[in-house]
From Swiss-Prot:
Keywords: Disulfide bond, Lipid-binding, Signal, Transport. GO terms for molecular function: lipid binding. InterPro entries: Bifun_inhib/LTP/seed_sf, Bifunc_inhib/LTP/seed_store, Plant_nsLTP. Plant non-specific lipid-transfer proteins transfer phospholipids as well as galactolipids across membranes. May play a role in wax or cutin deposition in the cell walls of expanding epidermal cells and certain secretory tissues. This is Non-specific lipid-transfer protein C, cotyledon-specific isoform. The keyword Disulfide bond applies. The keyword Disulfide bond applies. PANTHER family: NON-SPECIFIC LIPID-TRANSFER PROTEIN 2-RELATED. Pfam families: Tryp_alpha_amyl. Gene3D superfamilies: Plant lipid-transfer and hydrophobic proteins. It comes from Ricinus communis (Castor bean). Disulfide bonds join C28-C76, C38-C53, C54-C98, C74-C112. Residues 1-24 form the signal peptide.
Length: 116
């Protein structure tokens, strides 16, 4: 009987650990969709971030649950920014303009792996 109880507890512990390690970070498709309305401002074409930009980023911020989520979002934004011609002088202003606290410097040069 002790072996059965031990085996069940071991199995439950394994399943619990497995469930916690398989939580996926925020996918780039979600990041791109939520941040798409910000491209006009981030490239210097618009004079301020649109309401759609701020709403999308606020929704994205609500999905952040872990440090890995922050790092994933950072990596996605960096990858997209290269192909879109994003300019740091505009990009860095978006969090304050949209009243979003990100907890790390917003730049195309941010080292995403140092985020904690």
């Amino acid at each position: 009987m002790k072996n059965v109880v031990f085996s069940v507890l071991l199995l439950l512990s394994f399943l619990f650990c497995l469930a916690n390690t398989n939580e996926a970070a925020v996918p780039c498709s979600t990041v791109d969709m939520k941040a798409a309305a910000c491209v006009g401002f981030a490239t210097g074409k618009d004079s301020k971030p649109s309401q759609a930009c701020c709403t999308g980023l606020q929704q994205l911020a609500q999905t952040v649950k872990t440090v890995d989520d922050k790092k994933a979002i950072c990596r996605c934004l960096k990858a997209s920014s290269k192909s879109l011609g994003i300019k740091d002088q505009f990009l860095s202003k978006i969090p304050a303009a949209c009243n979003i606290k990100v907890g790390f410097p917003v730049s195309t040069n941010t080292n995403c792996e140092t985020i904690h």
